[in-house]
Amino acid sequence: MTEQPTNRNDVPRRGLGRDATVASICGLVVALMVGASYAAVPFYNWFCRATGFNGTTQVATAAPIAAPLPRKITVRFDSNVNGLPWKFTPEQTEIEIPIGQVVTVFYTVTNLSAHETTGQAAYNVAPLTVGAYFQKINCFCFTEQTFAAGETREMPVVFYVDPALAADPENDGLNSITLSYTFYPVRAPTPKPVAAGEPDSRKGAL
């Protein structure tokens, strides 16, 4: 019986086929990982807002129904600026309030530059375990803030500490909270709506 000669050209072709398959699979895995990393950012932000994880404060729509508790707590106010020519300070460095009482405090911002600038504040509270109980009704941190050259503005924060904090054994004995803000620059501010009858001076307007 005559042995058929082996076509050696088939071997590298089969190897190239396997390499192409492996490369395709690796590319798909990388694409999925990149997509997952982008999806993880909004999910992480949502998770923090929903649970108070990592000291993320909550957003309330109204004052608590229950009356304030006799127990009081000290709230300290911290302010920072990163990458903006702004002076940013709290009008009070700390206050003592009953748990459950709605309070309004003010921060002052001055744009020290000679041109308009826009920023938005990131925020958290310490210790991190109280994030779920620190309820903001109104805050300048909810939106971008644009300041004209040299402009100074007082900006309110309306908040309360949820009375449920008093029943949390993890925060038993807690007597102080620090609310911290850091303003960061907004490179591409959201365009402001133009009122009816006013010319639109934005770039590209007809």
UniProtKB/Swiss-Prot annotation:
The chain crosses the membrane at residues 23-43. This is Cytochrome c oxidase assembly protein CtaG. It is a single-pass type II membrane protein. The keyword Membrane applies. Exerts its effect at some terminal stage of cytochrome c oxidase synthesis, probably by being involved in the insertion of the copper B into subunit I. The keyword Cell membrane applies. Belongs to the COX11/CtaG family. The gene is ctaG. Keywords: Cell inner membrane, Cell membrane, Copper, Membrane, Signal-anchor, Transmembrane, Transmembrane helix. One of its GO terms (molecular function) is copper ion binding. Residues 44-206 are periplasmic. It is found in: Cell inner membrane.
